[in-house]
Amino acid sequence: MATKKSGGSSSNGRDSRGRRLGVKKFGSELVIPGNIIIRQRGTRYHPGRNVGMGKDHTIFSKIAGVVCFRKRTGGKVFVDVVPQSCLSSV
């Protein structure tokens, strides 16, 4: 029997992958229905007009349009999707 543990294999060296969270579509980017705009843990960003929120707090687009971020009193940040037809008339 060996009196020393053989070197060469480590019992450490494992780690999990990052969760790939964050903003996926930034302000003034075009989106189509179902596009993921933000992946997050908790509600750092809140759903606004024409967007939905999944059960894991993912914010996604409900219509085709342009992403818009807006801040409200209290520091809340809302995410909206504005239809392109509204932007072309301005």
Swiss-Prot record:
An annotated GO BP: translation
GO cellular component: ribonucleoprotein complex; ribosome
Recorded coiled-coil stretches: none
Organism: Anaplasma marginale (strain Florida)
HAMAP family named in the record: Ribosomal_bL27
Name of the molecule in the record: Large ribosomal subunit protein bL27
InterPro entries: Ribosomal_bL27, Ribosomal_bL27_CS
Ranges where the record places region Disordered: 1-20
Molecular function as annotated in GO: structural constituent of ribosome
Keywords tagged on the record: Ribonucleoprotein, Ribosomal protein
Family (UniProt): Belongs to the bacterial ribosomal protein bL27 family.
Biased composition (Low complexity): 1-13
